[in-house]
């Protein structure tokens, strides 16, 4: 019998290889030929699944986002009250596997400003990224449901902005940002945001009571 090929799985495999190639050689150095060679395919076989390098990059972005989503949501299902710090750490380059993902991510950011299609894709990715982290925030800090929409948005975007900045710093300066230091800085940011949100909420209640 002829071998049954799982084309979706093969596309994911190629996208994962592209992620590693971009992380190692940069966006410009990740040619179709280099990606095909790293995947063990001919360029003709690669073209059967993707028309252009940009299509591979977009597939890799979707794959990384899906994997981050899985890592952040599976622990939530396993525990009644997950720890926000532990979940958010899953998005940082704290080991070789996640460092590769993050190196790809930061390389992609460098292309967004000059490519209209990638800019549109980045807008979609950012919305999905916010959605994933919003779910984490709701699971870990149930009290945030009592916050105003503006406050939830501010806390959420502050977290994501911090993680993006920390990711870029850790990818660019690996020796200066070992995993322990990344986690410690993230812990401090989470604590500061939580304290600010709780203090702001108490102040709001006090003002409302005074007005009554």
Language-model segments: what does each one mean?
Residues 74-75, 97-106, 116-142, 157, ...:
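Amphipathic alpha-helical packing segments from all-alpha helical-bundle domains
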Residues 59, 70-101, 149-159:
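Hydrophobic alpha-helical connector segments
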Residues 119-123, 141-212:
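Hydrophobic/aromatic-rich alpha-helical bundle segments in the mid-to-C-terminal region
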Residues 62-67:
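Short, basic, alpha-helical segments at the C-terminal edge of helix-turn-helix-like DNA-binding modules
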């Amino acid at each position: 019998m002829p071998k049954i090929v799982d084309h979706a799985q093969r596309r994911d495999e190629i996208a994962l290889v592209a992620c590693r190639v971009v992380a190692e050689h940069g966006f410009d150095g990740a040619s179709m030929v280099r990606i095909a060679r790293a995947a063990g395919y001919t360029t003709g076989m690669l073209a059967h699944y993707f028309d252009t390098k940009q299509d591979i990059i977009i597939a890799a972005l979707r794959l990384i986002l899906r994997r981050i989503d899985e890592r952040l949501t599976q622990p939530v299902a396993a525990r009644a009250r997950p720890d926000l710090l532990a979940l958010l750490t899953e998005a940082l380059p704290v080991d070789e596997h996640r460092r590769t993902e993050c190196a790809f991510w930061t390389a992609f950011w460098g292309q967004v400003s000059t490519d209209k299609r990638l800019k549109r894709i980045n807008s979609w990715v950012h919305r999905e990224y916010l959605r994933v982290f919003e779910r984490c925030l709701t699971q870990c800090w149930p009290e945030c449901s009592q916050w105003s929409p503006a406050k939830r948005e501010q806390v959420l975007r502050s977290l994501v902005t911090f993680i993006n900045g920390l990711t870029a710093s850790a990818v660019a300066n690996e020796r200066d940002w070992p995993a322990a230091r990344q986690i410690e800085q993230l812990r401090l940011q989470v604590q500061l945001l939580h304290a600010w949100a709780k203090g702001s909420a108490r102040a709001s209640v006090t003002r409302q009571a005074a007005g009554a």
